[in-house]
C-alpha cells in the first residue's frame, strides 16, 4: 500500500487538501484529511505539490516496434502520462481482430518494465462487410470502443457515413481527422509540380479553410446520423468555429489539440521534424483561437500525437510528448488562460470521459485506478532545447504513481512495473436512440 499525504489534490472539478491511500490492488482505497498510516504502508510526501490524476493521452502513433515502445514508455511516464490510446492499423487483408491481437501482444511485451497503460483506436482505411464484422468483433471481445478514420481521404462519404452509423449501433465512437482529403491532395500535387515541397507545401495545401471545411463536414455527417463524434487534431480558428457552432446546437462533439499548435509558429520554409505531418504548424494568429477553444471547453483535451517525429534521445522531435504538461501549464495556467482544474480536465479527465474510461482514469476517488501525478507548480521555466522551436515550459513532474506504485521519480530510485491493457467498454445500448433524438432536436433548432 502507498499513502500520498500532505499535497493539494486537484481534480477537474475542485482542489482540496486530502490524503490518498492506494491499495495493493492498484486502486484508490481511501481519500480524506489526515488519513492514518496502515501497518506496512509506504508513505510518499506530497508536501508543497499538486496531486492530479495521471495524464491520459488520447492520440498516439508510436507504432508496433517493440524497441521503440519500450524506449518511449519511460519518456511518457517522465512527462506525467500514465495511459495512452494508440492508433492501431494493419495491412489490408489482415482481419481487424487479428491486427489488434498482434498489437496487444507487442505492446504488452514492450511495456512490461515501462509502467504505462495502453489502449487502442482501430484505424479504418476502407469500409466493407469484412471491416463491419471486424468492428463488431473488437468492440465485443477486445475492449475497443473507438475507430479512427480520415474524412475526405480514400474513403468516400458513403463509406465514412457507413462506418459512423455502424459504430453508433455498436456503442462506439468515431474519431475523424479532416486535414487531407481530395482538396488538399489536388493542391499538393500542383505544388509538387511547381517544385514546392516540405513544410511550405503542407501549409499551403492544408490551409486553414481546408481544415475548417473538412472538420465541419465530418461534424455534419455525424450529425445527420445522430452520432457523437470526436475530431482533431484541431489547429485553426475555422475548425474551432465549426466545433463551437455544432456544440451550441446541442451536437455531441469532442475535440483534441496538439501542444505544438498552441505555441509553435509555422511561418517560414524551414524543414523540421514532422513537417510532413498533418495538420501543419500555423501562423501565430491561430493560437489565440485555440486557447479560446480550450478555455471555453469547446476543445476539451490535449494529445501528443506522438509518432514518427521523435521523442527519443538523439532524435529531433516535436515538443508534444515531453512537453505536453509543461507547455499547457506555462502558456495556459501561468499565463492566466486556464485554471489548475482546467489543466486536469485537458490532460486526463476529458479524454477519459470521451473514451469511456472515466472514472477509472482521469479521476481521484475511491475505486479509481491509483494513477497520480505529483506536480511542482513552481517549477522554474526552462527551454525544451532538444525540441523543435525550443519552446518554454514550466512546472515539473516530481513523482508519478501508476497502479499504486511509484513508477517515476525525479528524486528517488523506483521500479516502474508493467503496464496493462485498458479495456474501454462500449457506451450503453440506449445511447444510440437518445443521441439520435437529441440530434433531431438540434437540427430543428
Where are these regions (language model features)?
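N-terminal metal-binding scaffold of metallo-dependent hydrolase/deaminase domains
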Residues: 1-38
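Histidine-centered divalent metal-coordination motifs
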Residues: 49, 59-63, 177, 233, ...
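Histidine/acidic residue-rich metal-binding segments in metalloenzymes
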Residues: 130-302
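His/Asp/Glu-enriched, well-ordered alpha-helical/loop segment
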Residues: 196-226, 271, 292-301, 305-377
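C-terminal cap of metal-dependent C-N hydrolases
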Residues: 366-423
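Intein/HINT protein-splicing elements and their conserved insertion hotspots or analogous self-processing inserts
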Residues: 410-445
Amino acid at each position: 500500500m502507498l499513502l500520498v499525504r500532505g499535497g493539494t489534490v486537484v481534480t477537474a472539478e475542485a482542489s482540496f487538501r486530502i490524503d490518498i491511500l492506494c491499495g495493493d490492488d492498484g486502486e484508490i482505497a481511501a481519500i480524506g484529511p489526515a488519513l492514518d498510516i496502515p501497518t506496512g504502508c509506504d508513505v510518499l510526501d506530497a508536501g508543497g505539490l499538486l496531486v492530479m490524476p495521471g495524464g491520459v493521452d488520447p492520440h498516439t502513433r508510436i507504432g508496433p516496434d517493440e524497441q521503440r515502445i519500450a524506449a518511449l514508455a519511460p519518456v511518457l511516464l517522465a512527462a506525467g502520462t500514465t495511459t495512452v490510446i494508440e492508433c492501431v492499423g494493419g495491412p489490408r487483408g489482415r482481419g481487424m481482430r487479428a491486427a489488434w491481437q498482434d498489437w496487444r501482444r507487442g505492446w504488452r511485451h514492450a511495456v512490461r518494465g515501462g509502467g504505462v497503460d495502453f489502449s487502442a483506436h482501430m484505424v479504418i482505411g476502407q469500409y466493407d462487410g469484412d471491416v463491419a464484422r471486424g468492428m463488431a468483433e473488437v468492440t465485443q471481445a477486445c475492449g475497443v470502443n473507438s475507430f479512427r478514420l480520415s474524412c475526405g481521404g480514400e474513403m468516400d462519404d458513403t463509406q465514412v457515413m457507413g462506418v459512423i452509423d455502424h459504430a453508433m449501433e455498436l456503442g462506439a465512437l468515431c474519431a475523424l481527422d479532416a486535414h487531407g482529403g481530395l482538396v488538399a491532395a489536388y493542391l499538393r500535387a500542383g505544388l509538387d509540380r511547381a517544385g514546392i515541397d516540405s513544410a511550405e507545401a503542407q501549409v499551403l495545401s492544408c490551409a486553414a479553410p481546408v481544415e475548417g471545411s473538412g472538420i465541419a463536414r465530418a461534424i455534419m455527417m455525424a450529425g445527420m446520423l445522430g452520432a457523437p463524434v470526436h475530431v482533431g487534431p484541431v489547429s485553426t480558428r475555422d475548425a474551432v468555429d465549426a466545433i463551437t457552432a455544432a456544440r451550441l446546437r446541442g451536437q455531441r462533439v469532442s475535440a483534441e489539440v496538439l501542444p505544438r499548435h498552441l505555441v509553435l509558429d509555422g511561418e517560414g520554409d524551414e524543414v523540421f521534424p514532422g513537417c510532413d505531418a498533418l495538420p501543419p504548424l500555423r501562423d501565430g494568429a491561430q493560437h489565440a483561437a485555440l486557447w479560446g477553444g480550450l478555455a471555453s471547453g469547446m476543445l476539451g483535451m490535449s494529445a501528443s500525437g506522438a509518432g514518427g517525429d521523435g521523442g527519443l534521445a538523439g532524435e529531433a522531435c516535436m515538443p508534444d510528448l515531453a512537453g505536453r504538461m509543461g507547455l499547457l501549464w506555462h502558456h495556459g495556467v501561468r499565463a492566466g488562460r486556464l485554471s489548475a482544474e482546467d489543466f486536469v480536465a485537458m490532460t486526463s479527465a476529458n479524454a477519459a470521459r470521451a473514451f469511456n474510461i472515466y472514472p477509472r482514469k482521469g479521476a481521484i476517488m475511491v475505486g479509481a485506478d491509483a494513477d497520480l501525478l505529483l506536480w511542482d507548480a513552481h517549477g522554474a521555466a526552462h527551454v525544451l532545447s532538444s525540441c523543435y522551436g525550443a519552446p518554454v515550459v514550466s512546472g515539473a513532474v516530481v513523482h508519478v504513481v501508476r497502479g499504486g506504485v511509484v513508477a517515476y521519480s525525479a528524486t528517488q530510485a523506483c521500479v516502474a512495473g508493467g503496464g496493462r491493457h485498458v479495456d474501454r467498454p462500449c457506451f450503453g445500448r440506449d445511447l444510440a436512440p437518445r443521441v439520435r433524438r437529441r440530434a433531431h432536436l438540434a437540427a430543428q433548432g
